[in-house]
Amino acid sequence: MTITRPPRQQRRALGDIGAYSALFAALTYSSFLLSRWTRPAASRGAAFISELEAPGQPYNWLFRLSDIASGLAIVVTALGVFVILEQQRWAKLVSVLVACVGVGSLIDGTTTMSCSPSVDQRCAAAESTASGLLQQLNQLHTDSGLIGFLSAAIGAVLLGMTLMVSSARWGRLMIAIGLTIAATGLLDICLLLAGADIGTTERLRTLLTSAWLASIGILLLRARPILTSAKPANQHDPAAKATMTVAQSARPQMTIEEST
């Protein structure tokens, strides 16, 4: 079965849509920054970001809506990533991981925490034990956050490895972001087990994910897929036919416009 790629103009348009979606998602993904005005006590770093969406919290609808909006935008971004990367190494896997970040954000916006550790002492105590952390894995809201974290960390590293061929600068940037996201996630677990607040590291990880999404948006706007299309002057010329066959079978590459 032969799979026909969309025309170059259509792929470019899809890439641009993915780029602008990524930039939009970068803003909405870090909507917790608005808590400085909606819930000042939660902006100090001690509370979980998800507590902003808990029932009864002021403007909880705003933060849940922002999670849903960013999730949808990230899923669209995944399509743009796939279209631009095409047949590059890890292209499909990177696109799936980006989409998983979006799905995780969607689930975050449609589910809530079972309790608020910043105001519930029993809930806070459960957060600081290994058994309590394992019990949280039975909650969809916790699972979605874990999926989003792992997908962002692994996706950023794999995207960086993919980009090293066409742009070492972009590749190193993506890898650095991915490793830092992973480090903050591991630090969160250590802090939870130690009974310390993780609000600061959780917010840092969220900002890093937003930075990654913004980087993807800029990358998609600057990237230009190269399509190899050769049409022989003489359809009956064996040499010309061979040239066309080789050109059509070549793996598409991607170039990135570097700023000076």
Please name every model-derived segment:
Residues 1-20, 223-260:
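Actinobacteria-biased recognition of intrinsically disordered, low-complexity terminal regions
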